[in-house]
Amino acid sequence: MIVVSVEASYRRVARTALREGTPATGERAVPEEVPVAFSYGGSTHAVMMASPADLIDFAVGFSLTEGIISMRSEIQAIEVVEAGQGYDVQVDLTDAEADALRARRRHMAGPVGCGLCGIESIEQAVRVVPDLSSVKSSVHGNDIVAAVKALNDAQTLNRETRAVHGAGFYNPREGLLAVREDVGRHNALDKLAGAVVNAGISAQMGIVAVTSRLSVEMVQKTAILGCPVLAAISAPTALAIETADRAGITLVALVRGEDFEIFTRADRIIL
């Protein structure tokens, strides 16, 4: 079963366009962007600007990739509450994880509201991630091409707006199993991670495909999800390549049509 977001998070606005030198009035679909807060134990941990869709998946994926939980069962409940112009996503953790997060907060220098949440030092920004070197997984080159194409075809929000990022999980045997979209590339990947975990999909036997460049955080989040192959339409950063190499992740970038470039663990790709 394909797990696809069907929540529309865009509006139509008036605009004036210039077409071949001639102005014309009309409408354009633009994505919504609202503040989304994640609260644990009644305290706000982070605030992101995000698309207001798939917030349960977002909460699970964010909690996982930021190291707040290590498995889905460590979240007892999630409630999404409207708060002014945005949403407060209230996450109820098990006692052990709640205690660990409180201890982590006591050492934080100040409030956080960005991609690297709860980070106290430069060393933590380049954090240790799971080593997937031993994961026995291989895919064909045409699977990489198919994964990116399937993601592009399934991006309903981007088709309307041409303004959002997408992240998808592709299994060579079953096709595209999950796709999530957001105005932020990190958010899209967190939402995908949550969708995969909530659906009970094994991340080890597939490909994470994204429509953005490959920064180090995208590699870190993919490693924590447990997927050994990450593919993108844009180029990677040097640190992303180094991190993927250490984590045993096959990093494929610049996927355009049937062309792509492999930067790490090329042995997993059957050409």
From Swiss-Prot:
Q: Name one GO molecular function term.
A: sulfurtransferase activity
Question: Where would you find this protein in the cell?
Answer: Cytoplasm
A Gene Ontology CC term for this entry?
cytoplasm
Q: Which domain of life is it from?
A: Bacteria
Extract one GO BP annotation from the record.
Answer: Mo-molybdopterin cofactor biosynthetic process
> Which keywords does this Swiss-Prot/TrEMBL entry list?
Cytoplasm, Molybdenum cofactor biosynthesis
> Where's it mainly located?
cytoplasm
Catalytic residues of the enzyme: C114
What does this chain do?
Required for formate dehydrogenase (FDH) activity. Acts as a sulfur carrier protein that transfers sulfur from IscS to the molybdenum cofactor prior to its insertion into FDH.
Q: Family, per the entry?
A: Belongs to the FdhD family.
This protein is called Sulfur carrier protein FdhD
Q: Which gene encodes it?
A: fdhD
